[in-house]
């Protein structure tokens, strides 16, 4: 009679034999990655997280080439060295093909851990599906086919957060419209009546509104790592590049400005003519930079008596300048940082004698009506230029005011004007926060003590008012070997008790 232990040993042997057989069979169906994906150095921190803002397909493009795909993203700057390329799979009705898209830096520095970058490649014609390799499997990525509807000049506004300065918004909407530009606004959060008014302006063709979502990595707890604290100014470079890519084949010129910046054409009747003049005089440049001249303005704090004409006539130059902004020729440039692109492209620094940005730096809010000022505002930049030609003519001021009156009398606008804020509480909170966390170091040239600048470090939660905030359906992969991708779909706005940064 066999000892009782023998059957137990036989069972174990049979079990391991079965598992070995199953493993051998399964290995026949598992793809083994190429050796370059097995580099141990890569995997010290892999998989890397990459947040994709947008992807654009170009059937035809002057600078990118035909049938090109550009993916705009943000990630740890080490990804540029550790990953280097994204492997893309494009699929259309008749074929599929893999292609390698080289990562390209957009942000010009490493002051913040996460930076903007792009990946560009030629893919199959008219793709219906785009997938990115995770180093072992693939994940589908949503993309847009770029529009070719002509918009000669586009003003891309840097992402708004806790936006409440409706005075600057209304001035910009009408000034840009009258001189032939289309506004494209990125919005993180905005007080409720401002968005309601903006929706009417969007329907009238003044502007396009785009929710600008914060980064959300579903595979990470923000208490362990918050990428939003590690991107520069709510990933402003990515927003500007998104705008450039969006209008790349439909616009002649794309300008990148803040909401308190105004470009008023001086040598022509509209933006397109002024920019075309510069481009024809300097045919080799890829972009222009206009310096920023700080000004002081006055505005009525209550919308029922607000007048754009009053604001424009009371612009006073302060003879102080700030770092300027750029106007890109999109057929010659594919991405950009906040003030200039990463690549060494040829630029034209426009002299203030020709024109500059009117920076509405300081605003004095008035309680009641004052005596009417009929003077044309002077153009008096820091160069001390004594120019008889005003900043803006009486004729154009009257046209702008007439256009504002037409819009403000619409019932869909008027019912929200009365609800616009009087006290700029959010603006004060953010201004104080920025002074402490950024500008104090920047002005003293002590950048070594400065954290990555951005509104995420500002606490505005104590001020409660109805706000619209950007939202979306977030998706994250968790099983990537080399990278994990994250993105948001169906971006929209949702009402919230308080604005968010």
Curated annotation (Swiss-Prot):
It is found in: Membrane. Disulfide bonds: none annotated. Its EC number is 2.4.1.-. The keyword Iron does not apply. This is Glycosyltransferase family 92 protein F13G3.3. Residues 151-439 form the GT92 domain. It comes from Caenorhabditis elegans. InterPro entries: Glyco_transf_92, GTase_92. One of its GO terms (molecular function) is glycosyltransferase activity. Its main location: membrane. It is a single-pass membrane protein. Belongs to the glycosyltransferase 92 family. It is an enzyme of class 2 (transferase). The keyword Transferase applies. GO terms for cellular component: membrane. Keywords: Glycosyltransferase, Membrane, Transferase, Transmembrane, Transmembrane helix. The lineage of its organism: Eukaryota, Metazoa, Ecdysozoa, Nematoda, Chromadorea. The chain crosses the membrane at residues 10-30. Pfam families: Glyco_transf_92.
């Amino acid at each position: 009679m066999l000892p009782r232990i023998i059957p137990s040993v036989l069972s174990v042997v049979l079990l391991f034999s079965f598992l070995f057989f199953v493993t051998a069979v399964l290995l026949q169906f598992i793809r083994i990655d190429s050796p370059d994906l097995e580099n141990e150095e890569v995997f010290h921190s892999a998989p890397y997280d990459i947040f994709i803002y947008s992807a654009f397909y170009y059937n035809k493009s002057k600078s990118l080439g035909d049938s090109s795909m550009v993916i705009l993203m943000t990630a740890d700057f080490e990804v540029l060295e550790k990953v280097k390329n994204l492997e893309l799979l494009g699929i259309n009705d008749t074929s599929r093909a893999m292609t390698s898209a080289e990562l390209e830096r957009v942000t010009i520095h490493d002051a913040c851990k996460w930076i903007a970058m792009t990946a560009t490649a030629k893919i199959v014609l008219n793709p219906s599906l785009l997938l990115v390799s995770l180093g072992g499997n693939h994940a589908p990525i949503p993309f847009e086919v770029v529009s070719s509807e002509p918009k000669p000049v586009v003003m891309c506004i840097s992402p708004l957060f806790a936006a409440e300065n409706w005075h600057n918004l209304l001035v910009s909407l009408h000034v840009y419209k009258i001189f032939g530009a289309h506004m494209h606004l990125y919005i993180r959060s905005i007080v409720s009546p401002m968005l309601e008014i903006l929706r009417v302006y969007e329907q009238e063709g003044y502007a396009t509104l785009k929710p600008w979502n914060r980064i959300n990595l579903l595979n990470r707890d923000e208490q362990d790592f918050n990428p939003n604290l590690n991107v520069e100014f709510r990933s402003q470079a990515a927003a500007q590049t998104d705008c450039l890519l969006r209008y790349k084949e439909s616009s002649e010129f794309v300008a990148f400005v803040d909401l308190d910046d105004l470009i008023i054409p001086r040598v022509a009747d509209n933006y397109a003519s002024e920019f075309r003049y510069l481009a024809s005089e300097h045919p080799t440049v890829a972009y222009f930079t206009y310096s920023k001249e700080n000004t002081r303005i006055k505005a009525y704090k209550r919308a029922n008596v607000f007048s754009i004409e009053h604001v424009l006539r009371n612009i006073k130059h302060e003879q102080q300048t700030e770092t300027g902004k750029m106007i890109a020729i999109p057929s010659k440039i594919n991405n950009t940082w906040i003030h200039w692109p990463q690549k060494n492209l040829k630029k034209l620094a426009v002299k203030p004698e020709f024109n500059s940005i009117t920076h509405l730096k300081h605003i004095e809010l008035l309680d009641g009506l004052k005596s009417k000022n009929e003077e044309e505002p002077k153009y008096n930049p820091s160069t001390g230029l004594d120019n008889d030609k005003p900043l803006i003519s009486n004729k154009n001021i009257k046209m702008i005011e007439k256009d504002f009156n037409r819009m403000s009398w619409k019932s869909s606008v008027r019912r929200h004007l009365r609800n616009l804020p009087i006290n700029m509480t959010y603006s004060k909170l953010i201004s104080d926060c920025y002074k402490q966390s950024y500008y104090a170091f920047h002005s003293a040239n002590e950048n070594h003590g400065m954290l990555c600048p951005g509104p995420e470090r500002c606490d505005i939660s104590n001020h409660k008012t109805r706000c619209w905030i950007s939202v979306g359906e977030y998706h994250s992969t968790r099983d990537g070997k080399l990278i994990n991708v994250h993105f948001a779909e169906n971006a929209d706005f949702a009402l919230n008790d308080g604005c968010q940064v």
